[in-house]
Amino acid sequence: MGLMRQLAVVALICQVVGCTPSHTPPISAADTEDFIAGALRPWGAGRLAITDPDARRFAVYDSALVALVMLRRGRRDDAGLILAGLAAVQADDGALPFSFTAPGPDKIRFVRSGAVAWVGYAATEYLDAESGGHERALALRLAVKAATYLLAHRVGGLVTGGEGDIRYEVDARGVHERIEPTTLEWISVEHNIDTYFFLRALARVTESPAYAEAASQLAAALSTRGWREDRGQLARGIGDVLDPVRALDCASWGAVFLAAIHDSRASRAYETAEHAYAVRDPRTGTSGHRPYADGPIFEDPRLQQFYQASLPSPSWDRLSAVWPEGSAGVALAALRTGHVERARAILDQLEPLRMRGDAMPTFTLDIPFTFDTEPSIAGTAWVELVRFEIARGPDRPTLWVQ
């Protein structure tokens, strides 16, 4: 379907009955309104959520999540402004910068397919939620261009990683990060889960068989090639070499994906996420989940050696720290596999971590180039989104629905 033809379907989908209610009460026990809304900054004709105010750094994934929260709070105009801000940084080929520092995206493209998919997904929710809104044409254009980029970067039905590779240089002055221009050929399972739900949503709002077929092909390839029977979860990556890393998102989000395609392995993936990554943070007494089950903290041996003296543990299985964003993903997996009370309990266990503005921290421990303990847009938004799902009940899902 050509771009102009797809844009023409706006008039046809204006009457779509959405899955996201237009007006809802606060979606969390904690009022995060000040933090979420306070992160928005003017950008072009719209707004973007600033990830790191001190560094003036923006991440499009964070902005997409804030747009989803705004839709659930009944703040449709604010969600539309965020989509306008995201459209302002979208390239002609549909790519979006994973993150960038003001005043604008870097000259070297740093694109991650998962972030592109989340932006597209937020745009489709805007279209699906209500028939009105000033940014319908913009939202459809944003989503279609994002899909065009992703579908142009497929191998065997799966999307590849994106563009720009992070390189680290270690010398006497410390560690320096740079981005090397390149097209990434590796296949991230997480990115493909993101893309699946985006394409399914876009197929629904545009009534396009092409998007539905692309999503079906992706699901078939991912469920077949991505599953690790020996680990009870989806792998982190798919390629010629077996990926040894056990990543939480590929267990938790993997469970949500498998549940959506009615694959019985969803329950096993949830159990893996729940137990293999479980941790208690001794500094706060909070229980939750860590991002990786085992392996070195840094995969780059130079970074591992440089920071080994300052790390409390050399490996993830011995690191006692909680990742709120990831824990919320486990809660969603619990909900989608029939463990409603456990889903609620996982989120309740995170509440003591609330910081200024009732934000969740990124992590409960600082790890250079990986995690910090600053207020997290993504972590805060994920907790709110999953609380909203729990409040509605398992029979009325809104996030990542089939």
Predicted regions mapped to residue ranges:
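Bacterial N-terminal signal peptides
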Residues: 7-16
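Extended ligand-binding clefts on enzyme/binding-domain cores
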Residues: 25-61, 95-98, 108-114, 128-325, ...
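Alpha-helical support elements that line or immediately flank enzyme active sites
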Residues: 63-79, 83-86, 251-252, 258, ...
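Helix-terminus loop motifs that line ligand-binding clefts
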Residues: 76-119, 349-367
